[in-house]
């Protein structure tokens, strides 16, 4: 039965579950956006590639998203699934007000009559008409469903707010960055909500925010203070504290508190609440004592290039160059040319590069066709507000080697099974580099970004990617060494480039504390 944007899918009830005398209805939806309020990249409705109803259900089957886990566990439990929406946009500027209103209205329209809600959200969405996209949605859902369990799976980079906490029954955040536990986070969330539906448990949510704006490159769980914080959280989980999450926050958002926080879902008992308060305080003190380790200090770009050249001597695998100041998954344009220009000027050769986003150049190269030799202006076509930087495109001579419609299926481990679209895609070959140029900004989190144009990145001396962390599970094992490259891009780690006016002060490291 389809109503509005929702589809009702009835699964036979599991046997041996006398508590459920009829099929319970569970609303399951996905709405993901991490907002960089300084990004010049717009976020209209089309950026989300939204799918509705039955299509939303089908789009998540076989994937490793939190929503996919919700579907799997709810079906196993014998619930009736309502799947009004699945929508995800790459990080970019504030969500257009009309897009936010339409997407949230779709979820809200499906809420009446539901016995539980499972939401796959990000936690750092800012729209033109609200600084707290998730909090406002959850508040309206709670008003519509005052007594039903609402479980939320969130990204590790969520900017948690009072509204998010007050209107959620269960909150679970990713425990990895790069994010390779999306599905597991969804499982965790769904298990707790199903326990509530079966009358086995009741939960309370506790929150401890810190005045700490972490740099994204220091929020990885591969090493350092964030890894230790997550290890403490995992060690503390148990029957009375079933979910302990450490959120690094997303600092490139000019809102009240784009900060680190600790969120605990605990048993709704005196002892459970007391343990939650104790653990929140313990984790917050641990993080604050190591706050300096959440700050990233970059080296000059010229030093990075010289270091890359030294590392490449006698290397039998590529040296990985990460252009993290123009990272698509933090709101970058994938358009800045600083790092590629520096690489060329320092004499780096035999490079695989990409994806660079330049729809104008793509259009020219598609019209020219495979085999065409061109002298083309590439990149630096999007103004880098708020820095006000206007740069000239890089003039490049090369040959069009491959053309593609730019669609591939991610092989994982990030977004496994997801259909990805880079728009029309070109492989441009120059004397020193093979460059993948796309119509849409796209994070290189999957080997498919190169394979789609017939390029094997492992055969090059240098591999230049516009990425911070998402690329690492796939590309770091292929590399001899890794060099992080900074520049004045839209996702730079240099906070002085961004005019924060709404952030509550004092806050570290903007202020010495």
Language-model regions, residue ranges each:
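Short, Lys/Arg-enriched N-terminal segments with co-localized hydrophobic residues
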Residues: 10-23
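Conserved anion/nucleotide-ligand pocket segment
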Residues: 195-233
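Active-site histidine-anchored catalytic micro-motif
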Residues: 27-40, 93-104, 112-201, 318, ...
């Amino acid at each position: 039965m389809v109503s509005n944007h929702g589809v009702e899918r009835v699964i036979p009830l599991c046997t041996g579950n006398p508590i459920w005398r009829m099929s319970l209805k569970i609303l399951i939806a996905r709405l993901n956006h991490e907002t960089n309020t300084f990004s010049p990249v717009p976020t209209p409705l089309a950026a989300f590639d939204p799918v509705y109803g039955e299509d939303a259900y089908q789009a998540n089957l076989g994937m490793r998203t939190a929503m996919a886990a919700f579907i799997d566990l709810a079906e196993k439990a014998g619930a009736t699934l309502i799947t009004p929406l699945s929508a995800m946009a790459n990080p970019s500027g504030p969500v257009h007000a009309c897009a936010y209103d339409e997407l949230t209205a779709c979820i809200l329209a499906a809420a009446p009559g539901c016995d539980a809600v499972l939401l796959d959200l990000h936690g750092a969405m800012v729209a033109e008409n609200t600084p707290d996209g998730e909090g406002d949605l959850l508040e309206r859902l709670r008003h519509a469903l005052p007594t039903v369990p609402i479980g939320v799976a969130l990204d590790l980079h969520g900017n948690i707010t009072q509204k998010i906490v007050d209107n959620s029954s269960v909150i679970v955040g990713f425990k990895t960055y790069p994010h390779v536990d999306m599905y597991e986070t969804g499982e965790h969330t769904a298990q707790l909500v199903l326990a509530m539906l079966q009358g086995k448990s009741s939960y309370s949510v506790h929150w401890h925010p810190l005045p700490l704006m972490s740099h994204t490159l220091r929020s990885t769980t591969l090493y350092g203070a964030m890894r230790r914080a997550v290890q403490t959280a995992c060690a503390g989980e148990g029957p009375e504290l079933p979910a302990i999450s450490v959120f690094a926050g997303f600092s490139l958002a000019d809102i009240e508190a784009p900060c680190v926080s600790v969120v605990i879902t605990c048993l709704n008992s005196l002892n459970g609440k007391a343990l939650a308060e104790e653990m929140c305080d313990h984790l917050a003190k641990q993080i604050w004592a190591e706050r300096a380790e959440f700050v990233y200090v970059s080296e000059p770009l010229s030093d990075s290039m010289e270091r890359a050249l030294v590392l490449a001597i006698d290397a039998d695998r590529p040296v990985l160059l990460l252009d993290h100041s123009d990272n698509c998954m933090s709101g970058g344009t994938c358009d800045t040319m600083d790092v590629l220009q520096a690489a060329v000027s320092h004499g780096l050769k035999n490079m695989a590069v990409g994806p660079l986003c330049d729809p104008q150049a793509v259009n020219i190269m598609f019209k020219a066709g495979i085999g065409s030799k061109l002298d083309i202006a590439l990149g630096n076509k999007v103004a880098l507000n708020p820095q006000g930087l206007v740069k000239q495109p890089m003039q490049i001579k090369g040959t069009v080697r491959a053309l593609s419609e730019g669609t591939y299926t991610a092989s994982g481990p990030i977004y496994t099974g997801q259909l990805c679209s880079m728009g029309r895609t070109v492989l441009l070959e120059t004397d020193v580099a093979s460059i993948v140029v796309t119509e849409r900004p796209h994070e290189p989190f999957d080997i498919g970004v190169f394979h789609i144009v017939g390029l094997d990145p492992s055969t090059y001396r240098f591999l230049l990617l516009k990425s911070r962390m998402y690329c690492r599970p796939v590309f770091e094992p292929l590399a001899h060494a890794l060099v992080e490259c900074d520049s004045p891009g839209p996702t730079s780690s240099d906070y002085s480039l961004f005019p924060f006016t709404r952030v509550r002060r004092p806050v570290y490291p903007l202020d010495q504390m």
